[in-house]
């Protein structure tokens, strides 16, 4: 429960008790206070899509998506749709109203008893049929489709829409895989409209779904040729503009006799301040207006009264996303508490994002800074990140979770301070790279596995990692020259298969081969090496 709601309940309890700490019998409205508070949200909740605040084009796009599944229109371009937007912008409400208006029935998928197909060692999909209530993805999908089809094969008047809500916060891997499997089947079968709802929080699952939920767009290039381009079928729901919200506030004030008074001496606009405090969240906005009415009744609410209310009403925490958080840390130092709050959003990833992107930020945002000064800043930040790495090791090796703020201080706060303390920073928009650390960890394990496998060969038991790197470098050079006989002469005495030689070549990640080996070249090498594979 938000602090605003808690404050409202506190106000209600104070109003219903007199000085003698007894119920106030004279106040006839006390009995209905709870009902009135609840009805504030119900009273101003849109009953049709035309009443929804925000971009009407998004509403039309969702309606057009559902219209594909009517009897008259059999052609379905894309059966899946993904809606993204910040919390509180009305994604779910908008979806529910449009589904109702278009004559569909909303189905919230229950994925608890669904078994997901897995790949065996032979890379063949094996789908286990479980006894009891467990169902396969295909069985579940068929069940959904049968709900919208009559025994004669005609579409039932009450069609269904499957909605996966709040996908960004799903933590169960089984459910994630089930959703992806259902989307994959529906992309092929195109029998059921599926809507995915997610927030703007960084999520690997959501990113994967965006790549799966695609639509074909027909274009004509500059030469007059037709081209089919696949793009993500995503609708980004943005918050209403301030003018719309201002009109909505004025409407509620008229209906509830809430007197917001703007004085000539006020430096700021009270409407604008309320909008900013609501953070463009309409649900939160209604709670704020409700609280002001409960506190001040029919009295005027000036900017001073609102400032006093704002002091005790905490703003909601907004997840800025890892890229926006990285940009804020690198280009705008917000103090210790501000930087730590960004760190708290994604403790593992954001420090790595800072580490990945701070050198390029210094280079591009300080063009007038000398190379020596740039190196000095990099040195300070790298020392701080190095300290954070030591603390990170202590946290996970000794379970010292209380040290996480210290880790955040060295990994985010100090780097943000050092990188923003110098004058004349451009602060231009940048495209940040996703951290390569996770990939490097995976590569390290793969390389260790390859080296251990190669060292099983009696000729390579005592070969060090440096020797393998030299081997990889020499082999790459020879292969790029297409000198296959030289490769065979060097490697034949070791008795290695071509696959093992290719694995050794891949150990060197610094210098990549310009061209991979073709099938004919691999066959030629196998013959020269005297191996089958």
From Swiss-Prot:
Q: Which domain of life is it from?
A: Viruses
Entry keywords, A to Z: DNA replication
Q: Does the keyword Cell membrane apply?
A: no
Q: Which organism is it from?
A: Acanthamoeba polyphaga mimivirus (APMV)
Similarity annotation: Belongs to the activator 1 large subunit family.
Q: Which parts of this chain are annotated as the region Disordered? A: 1-31
Q: What is this protein called?
A: Putative replication factor C large subunit
Among the GO molecular function terms of this UniProt record, one is: DNA binding
A Pfam family annotated for this chain is RFC1
Where in the sequence does UniProt note compositional bias of the Basic and acidic residues kind? 17-31
Keyword Ribonucleoprotein part of the UniProt annotation? no
Compositionally biased intervals (Polar residues): 1-11
> What InterPro entries does UniProt report for this protein, alphabetically?
DNA_pol3_clamp-load_cplx_C, DNA_replication_fac_RFC1_C, P-loop_NTPase
Role noted for this protein? Part of the RFC clamp loader complex which loads the PCNA sliding clamp onto DNA.
What's one GO BP annotation on this UniProt entry?
DNA replication
């Amino acid at each position: 429960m938000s602090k605003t709601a808690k404050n409202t309940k506190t106000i209600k309890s104070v109003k219903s008790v007199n000085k003698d700490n007894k119920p106030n019998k004279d106040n006839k409205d006390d009995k209905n206070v709870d009902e009135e508070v609840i009805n504030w949200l119900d009273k101003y909740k849109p009953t049709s899509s035309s009443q929804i605040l925000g971009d009407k084009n998004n509403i039309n796009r969702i309606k057009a998506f559902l219209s594909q599944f009517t009897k008259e229109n059999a052609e379905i371009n894309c059966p899946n749709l993904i809606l993204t937007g910040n919390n509180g912008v009305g994604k779910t409400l908008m979806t529910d109203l449009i589904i109702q208006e278009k004559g569909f029935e909303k189905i919230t998928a229950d994925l608890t008893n669904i078994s997901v197909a897995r790949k065996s060692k032979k890379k063949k999909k094996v789908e286990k049929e479980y006894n009891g209530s467990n169902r396969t993805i295909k069985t579940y999908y068929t069940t959904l489709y049968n709900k919208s089809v009559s025994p004669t094969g005609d579409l039932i008047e009450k069609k269904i829409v499957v909605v996966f809500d709040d996908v960004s916060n799903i933590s169960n891997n089984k459910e994630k895989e089930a959703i992806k499997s259902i989307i994959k089947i529906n992309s092929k079968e195109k029998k059921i409209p599926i809507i995915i709802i997610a927030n703007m929080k960084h999520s690997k699952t959501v990113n994967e779904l965006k790549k799966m939920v695609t639509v074909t767009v027909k274009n004509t290039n500059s030469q007059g040729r037709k081209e089919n381009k696949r793009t993500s079928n995503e609708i980004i729901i943005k918050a209403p503009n301030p003018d719309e919200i201002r009109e909505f506030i004025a409407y509620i004030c008229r209906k509830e006799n809430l007197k917001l008074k703007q004085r000539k001496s006020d430096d700021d606009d009270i409407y604008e301040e309320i909008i900013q405090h609501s953070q463009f969240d309409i649900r939160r906005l209604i709670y704020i207006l409700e609280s002001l009415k409960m506190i001040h009744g029919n009295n005027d609410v000036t900017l001073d009264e609102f400032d006093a209310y704002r002091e005790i009403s905490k703003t909601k925490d907004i997840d800025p996303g890892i890229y926006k958080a990285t940009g804020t840390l690198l280009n705008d130092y917000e103090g210790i508490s501000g930087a730590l709050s960004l760190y708290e959003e994604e403790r593992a990833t954001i420090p790595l994002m800072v580490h990945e992107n701070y050198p390029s930020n210094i280079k591009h945002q300080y063009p007038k800074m000398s190379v020596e000064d740039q190196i000095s800043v990099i040195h300070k930040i790298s020392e701080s990140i190095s300290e954070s790495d030591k603390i990170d090791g202590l946290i996970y090796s000794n379970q010292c979770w209380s040290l996480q703020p210290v880790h955040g201080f060295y990994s985010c706060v100090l780097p943000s301070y050092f990188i923003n303390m110098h004058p004349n920073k451009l602060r231009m928009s940048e495209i940040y790279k996703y951290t390569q650390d996770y990939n490097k960890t995976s590569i390290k394990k793969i390389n260790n596995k390859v080296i251990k496998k190669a060292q099983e060969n009696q000729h390579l038991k005592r070969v060090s990692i440096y020797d393998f790197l030299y081997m990889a470098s020499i082999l790459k050079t020879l292969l790029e020259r297409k000198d296959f006989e030289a490769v065979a002469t060097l490697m034949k005495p070791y008795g290695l298969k071509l696959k093992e030689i290719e694995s050794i070549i891949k150990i060197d990640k610094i210098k990549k081969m310009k061209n991979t080996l073709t099938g004919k070249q691999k066959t030629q090498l196998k013959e020269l090496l005297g191996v089958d594979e």
